[in-house]
Amino acid sequence: MFLTYFDAMPRRVLALVSLACVALLAFGLYLQHVVGLEPCPMCIVQRYALVLVAVVAGITAVAKSRGLLITGSGLLVLLSGFGAFVAARQSFLQWYPPEVASCGRDFYGMIETFPLKRAIPMIFKGSGDCTKIDWTFLGLSIANWSFLCFVAIALVGLVLITRLARQR
């Protein structure tokens, strides 16, 4: 069955999650630099969350102990939950845009002063409108797809935690 893969190879599952996050980030960069879509502040926050999920999944994939696997998977759930929250908020703003389009310039200011912004400016620079839907696939916006991806990652983390805790 599908869930036995989580029991037999949890490190491989985490490595695949990390690779999937890198692929999603690469696609976001493609949309930004090749297609010409400008990311909004909420998109940038989702990128931060995706980078953190990729790093945590990658580090947890090489963990030797079951306790570290469970802890890393828990952190994966928290980070992807945060990313899902931001994506859900952006989706809500896209479905029900306010009369004055704003996605939180104070939030954007926090992002602009974050040290990682200086280290990787090309990835985390953007000024788009959070309520604007620039691109869709199968009727869903980028924020909708981002939400679904974060939820899927959180579910993978929850399954890993459950399966690993039962093995004790």
From Swiss-Prot:
Residues 1-13, 65-70, 164-168 are cytoplasmic. It is a multi-pass membrane protein. Disulfide bonds join 40-43, 103-130. It is found in: Cell inner membrane. Residues 31-48, 89-144 are periplasmic. Keywords: Cell inner membrane, Cell membrane, Chaperone, Disulfide bond, Electron transport, Membrane, Oxidoreductase, Redox-active center, Transmembrane, Transmembrane helix, Transport. The chain crosses the membrane at residues 14-30, 49-64, 71-88, 145-163. Pfam families: DsbB. GO terms for biological process: protein folding. One of its GO terms (molecular function) is electron transfer activity. SUPFAM superfamilies: DsbB-like. GO terms for cellular component: plasma membrane. HAMAP family: DsbB. Required for disulfide bond formation in some periplasmic proteins. Acts by oxidizing the DsbA protein. Belongs to the DsbB family. This is Disulfide bond formation protein B.
